[in-house]
Amino acid sequence: MSLLIALVPMIAWGSIGLVSGKIGGSANQQTLGMTIGALLFSIVVFFVIQPTLTTATLIVGFISGLFWSLGQNQQFHSMKYMGVSVGLPISTGMQLVVNTVAGAVFFHEWTKTKDFVVGFIALAFLVFGVYLTARQDDDSQPKTSNSMLDFNKGIRALIFSTVGYGVYTIIINATGLDPWGIILPQSIGMLVGASFFAFKKVKVDRFVWMNMTTGLLWGLGNICMLLTMREIGLAISFSLSQMGIIISTLGGIFLLGERKSKKEMFYVIFGCIFVILGGILLGYMKA
């Protein structure tokens, strides 16, 4: 059951880039709208579950939310600079490395030699798959490039994004606090952080309100990942959640109209296959 719940973030989070890309708006508008939606989701969950809130839960949740807002804001910027089908796969690969190493090494989630062998093979498959989905055909760049894309700015944004996302998950796993109690203060921290990035920079209009939909998707994926993180560990739960890259990459091409050459489509297909193989290996570890 834990493995099935761990796959919910894959679908929910894998759809966020597509939904926000379809809705439109600036990176700041997308982040602000998303955090408002996540706050509404957490308020409903709080009144339904009625978890106990401690001082530690409030502080850790709030800090986690602040760092998440940094990660998400910079990821939206990277997608503006690099496109969804390129920016999101690279972001996923960077997060996979950080969270897997943290879970396996620092939190001692992998204790046997087999765990490390199978785990790092799975990670290699995932990262290689992510690399293939983001790989570009140099010969076709004049045809497929967009004048608004900037790879260097995108990479800088992704570095900040990875730091933010890394702290968001690692701090919660390190403290072992109740996930149901975490999400409300976490969503408040998210909104505060998003408001900071959007201060005097964002026009609150229909793009903000429509992007609340992505917040509901994020909230669903978030609580499922936090719950499974305690059962199967950070390394595996986070890695499985990032398999949504298949949805975001193919959706970016077929739904958002991001153009790919024949060679790039070849890379994407084989990249998705490697991501799936990596996910199967991770599932085997906890079977």
Swiss-Prot record:
GO terms for molecular function: carbohydrate transmembrane transporter activity. Keywords: Cell membrane, Membrane, Sugar transport, Transmembrane, Transmembrane helix, Transport. It is found in: Cell membrane. Its main location: membrane. GO terms for cellular component: plasma membrane. It is a multi-pass membrane protein. Coiled coil: none annotated. Belongs to the GRP transporter (TC 2.A.7.5) family. This is Putative sugar uptake protein EF_0928. It comes from Enterococcus faecalis (strain ATCC 700802 / V583). The lineage of its organism: Bacteria, Bacillati, Bacillota, Bacilli, Lactobacillales.
